[in-house]
């Protein structure tokens, strides 16, 4: 038995698809119901009424039909020429039949003589109706289509009822009404404000378009803020729409099934119109029934009446009219499907009217479903389109983001960075919370892995902002925000996500002093940039490029001659052309990192103002060119670390002004005595080499403050090392030292001592003389500390927290 609950669920399931049924589907539905009533009525009449009444047996049969005796006599007289021929007379047989005999004759005549169309007419109507109904509803129950349709209907109802839909539509209406007023006000402001006028004129003077620069958005006064629950619900709808679109747009199975349904209906319509009118003529009231039952009843032919003939003719005619209406509608729907491009759906008209100009066009089954929904009510597709717009989604994300990131939560994220600046680091968010602009004390804003960031005019509230870091994020800057950054931003760090894509707004930062660009920036793209862009960076002093280049971009050497520091990390790719370095005469610091250099480039020796040179992580094996550094009178810092240098040439002594020398992570085995002619050295790092001893002449480095020989093979320290009275940091770890000279106590300025990883058995008690050395800055095995006298240990421990 089917319960009422099951019937109710079935009815609800059918009614949920009403938005996908055009007017012809509704028309078919009602015609099908009428056809079904015709079938039921005809069937009921056939079952309840007497089928065939045969109450007049034929007593005289003449010329293969029933006749009265007088007709036979007259015919015989006209045809017979012999008057003596006897007339045939009917047999004298009992003609009063029993009721059961009449019933028998009725049944036999119904089965043998009544035309099949008259007998099966109700069943044919029922069969046709069921086929029509099946064709109309097959796509709603076929698994491959019904699942998609159910998903679409469920999402569509949520889109229709979502508060976000109402908010977006009302916002569109409000913006359209407010836009003319805003435009007139903006003209007045631009004409009265000198700063704004300068910005506007600057924009007009740009000879190229400005991607990434957008006008400030107009805030709708009528827009209401969603609560957290409504925001999460709208966010879930956006995700469902994305997944549904991705799934449905791949195929056109719904379109093909619906089209085949209509084709079957048209074929069935043609078939019915062909045979039903023809067989309708075979339904007659009177039936001449000839059956071979004379032995049982005494008669062979009977005159019968089919009592349902007239009403069946009426019902059949009415049924034909219904089929014609059904067929014409099916033909129209077939023509509509073949004429229209139902696999493409464009929101162009909606994009022109609304402020969501990014609503994408859809295709295949998604487009077809929307076309069907438009036949029911175009408002459904309009509301649905809001959840296809990325602009709409971004606005929702912004609202949810603001609800999540309150001012208190953002303040808890403020930290002091290594440069002692107040920094806010936002990582993997959906956008930039509006409450960020309430943190006026912030000096550094770091944005990492944020897909879409927009800096509005509210950034001008961050009066202390001097540094901006954008790592693997897409940043769009409004014009008012750009005006603020032009005046206040000093340091900009960018890590690119897309190859060679440098935002154009970077070249408007006229007060920028340091620019860090990290990513796959191709030299061709750099050289083809608008020259005016780099020329505007007149205050730029530091440029850092991390990329894979074959040469230093010409735009850097030609348009930034006043650059003081250039750092290039080539990520292991070979840097071939370096001749254009000669143009950068004002360069004070040069870093060529991971450039696969095998020799020191000669173009460096032309940089007379160079103070610092860093060539780390290259493939340098020899540095014979070091003699040429004597022409660089200002060179004070030389870093040749992380290379394959086997020896230090004796010409190193010519660098009398050298103050810092880094040769760690090489293959150096010996130190030339000329090295100790660089008496201004205060920093010397020889860690991770193959040194076995340190010359006694190290005592001439009287200004030495930092000395590192970690991870070598040194067995003994020269006494001259302890003559470097200014030594503050001494790193001797991971060597082969057997003992530590008592002269270590003479290093009164020593603050950091590393001895771990040697073969020491005891520590000299003279360590007590290192008054600046603290326990936490003495890196040694714990058991060696126990060899020190207790007063020395206690003194080291008392100042543990001050190191």
Swiss-Prot record:
GO BP annotations listed: aspartate transmembrane transport; cyclic-GMP-AMP transmembrane import across plasma membrane; intracellular signal transduction; monoatomic anion transmembrane transport
Extracellular side stretches: 47-119, 283-307
Protein's gene: LRRC8B
Recorded topology in the membrane: Multi-pass membrane protein
LRR repeat feature ranges: 464-486, 488-509, 511-532, 539-559, 562-582, 586-607, 609-630, 634-655, 657-678, 680-701, 703-724, 726-747, 749-771
Name of protein: Volume-regulated anion channel subunit LRRC8B
Cytoplasmic face of the membrane: 1-25, 141-261, 329-803
Glycan-linked positions: 78
UniProt domain comment: The volume-regulated anion channel (VRAC) channel forms a trimer of dimers, with symmetry mismatch between the pore-forming domain and the cytosolic LRR repeats, a topology similar to gap junction proteins.
SMART domains the UniProt entry points to: LRR_TYP
Cystines in this chain: 55-304, 109-289
Localization (cell): Cell membrane; Endoplasmic reticulum membrane
Subunit structure comment from the entry: Heterohexamer; oligomerizes with other LRRC8 proteins (LRRC8A, LRRC8C, LRRC8D and/or LRRC8E) to form a heterohexamer. In vivo, the subunit composition may depend primarily on expression levels, and heterooligomeric channels containing various proportions of the different LRRC8 proteins may coexist.
Gene3D superfamilies given in the database record: Ribonuclease Inhibitor
Keyword Membrane: yes
């Amino acid at each position: 038995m089917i319960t009422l609950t099951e019937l109710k669920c079935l009815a609800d399931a059918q009614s949920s698809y009403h938005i996908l049924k055009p007017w012809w589907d509704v028309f078919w539905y009602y015609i099908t119901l009428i056809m079904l009533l015709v079938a039921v009525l005809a069937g009921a009449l056939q079952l309840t009424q007497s089928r065939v009444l045969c109450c007049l047996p034929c007593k005289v049969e003449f010329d293969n039909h029933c006749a009265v005796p007088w007709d036979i006599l007259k015919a015989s007289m006209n045809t017979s020429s012999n008057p003596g021929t006897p007339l045939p007379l009917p047999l004298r047989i009992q003609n009063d039949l029993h009721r059961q005999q009449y019933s028998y004759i009725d049944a036999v005549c119904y089965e043998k003589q009544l035309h099949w169309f008259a007998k099966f007419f109700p069943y044919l109507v029922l069969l046709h109706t069921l086929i029509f109904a099946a064709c109309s509803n097959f796509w709603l129950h076929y698994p491959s289509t019904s699942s998609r349709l159910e998903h679409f209907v469920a999402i569509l109802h949520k889109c229709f009822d979502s508060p976000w839909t109402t908010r977006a539509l009302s916002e569109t209406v409000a913006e359209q009404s407010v836009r003319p007023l805003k435009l007139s006000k903006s003209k007045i402001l631009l004409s009265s404000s000198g700063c704004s006028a300068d910005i506007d004129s600057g924009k007009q003077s740009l000879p190229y378009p400005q991607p990434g620069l957008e006008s400030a958005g107009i805030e709708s006064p009528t827009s209401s803020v969603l609560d957290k629950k409504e925001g999460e619900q709208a966010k879930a709808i956006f995700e469902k729409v994305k997944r549904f679109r991705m799934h449905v747009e791949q195929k056109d199975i719904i379109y093909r099934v619906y089209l085949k349904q209509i084709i079957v209906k048209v074929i069935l319509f043609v078939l019915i119109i062909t045979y039903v009118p023809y067989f309708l003529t075979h339904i007659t009231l009177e039936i001449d029934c000839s059956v071979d039952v004379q032995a049982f009843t005494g008669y062979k032919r009977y005159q019968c009446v089919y009592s349902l003939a007239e009403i069946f003719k009426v019902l059949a005619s009415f049924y034909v009219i219904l089929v014609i209406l059904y067929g014409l509608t099916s033909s129209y729907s077939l023509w509509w499907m073949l004429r229209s491009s139902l696999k493409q759906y464009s929101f162009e008209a909606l994009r022109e009217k609304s402020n969501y100009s990014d609503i994408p066009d859809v295709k295949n089954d998604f487009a077809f479903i929307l076309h069907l929904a438009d036949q029911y009510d175009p408002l459904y597709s309009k509301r649905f389109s809001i959840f296809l717009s990325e602009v709409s989604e971004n606005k929702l994300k912004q609202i949810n983001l603001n609800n999540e990131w309150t001012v208190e939560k953002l303040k808890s994220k403020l930290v002091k960075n290594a440069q002692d600046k107040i920094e806010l680091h936002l990582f993997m968010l959906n956008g930039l919370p509006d409450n960020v602009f309430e943190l006026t004390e912030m000096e550094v804003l770091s944005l990492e892995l944020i897909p879409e960031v927009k800096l509005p005019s509210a950034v001008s509230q961050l009066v202390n902002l001097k540094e901006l870091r954008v790592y693997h994020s897409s940043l769009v800057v409004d014009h008012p925000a750009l005006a603020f950054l032009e005046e206040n931003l000093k340091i900009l760090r960018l890590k690119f996500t897309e190859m060679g894509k440098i935002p154009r707004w970077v070249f408007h930062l006229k007060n920028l002093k340091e620019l860090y660009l990290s990513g796959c920036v191709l030299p061709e793209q750099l050289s083809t940039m608008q020259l005016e862009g780099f020329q505007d960076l007149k205050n730029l002093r530091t440029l850092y490029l991390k990329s894979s280049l074959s040469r230093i971009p010409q735009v850097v050497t030609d348009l930034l001659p006043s650059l003081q520091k250039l750092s290039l990390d080539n990520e292991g790719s070979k840097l071939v052309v370096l001749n254009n370095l000669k143009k950068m005469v004002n360069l004070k610091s040069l870093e060529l990192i991971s450039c696969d250099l095998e020799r020191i480039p000669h173009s460096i020796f032309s940089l007379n103002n160079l103070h610092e040179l860093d060539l780390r992580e290259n493939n340098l094996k020899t540095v014979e060119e070091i003699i040429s550094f004597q022409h660089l009178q200002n060179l004070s810092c030389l870093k040749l670390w992380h290379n394959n240098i086997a020896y230090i040439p004796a010409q190193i002594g010519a660098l009398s002004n050298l103050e810092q020398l880094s040769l760690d992570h090489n293959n150096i085995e010996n130190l030339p005595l000329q090295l100790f002619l660089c008496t201004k050295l205060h920093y010397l790092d020889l860690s991770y080499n193959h040194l076995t001893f340190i010359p006694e002449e190290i005592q001439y480095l009287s200004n030495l403050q930092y000395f590192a020989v970690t991870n070598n093979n040194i067995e003994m320290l020269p006494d001259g090392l302890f003559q470097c009275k200014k030594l503050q940091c001494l790193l001797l770890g991971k060597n082969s030292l057997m003992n530590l000279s008592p002269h270590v106590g003479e290093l009164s300025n020593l603050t950091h001592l590393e001895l771990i990883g040697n073969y020491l058995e005891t520590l000299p008690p003279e360590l007590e003389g290192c008054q600046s050395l603290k326990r936490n800055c003495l890196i040694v095995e714990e058991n060696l500390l126990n060899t020190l006298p207790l007063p020395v240990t206690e003194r080291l421990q008392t100042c543990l927290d001050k190191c």
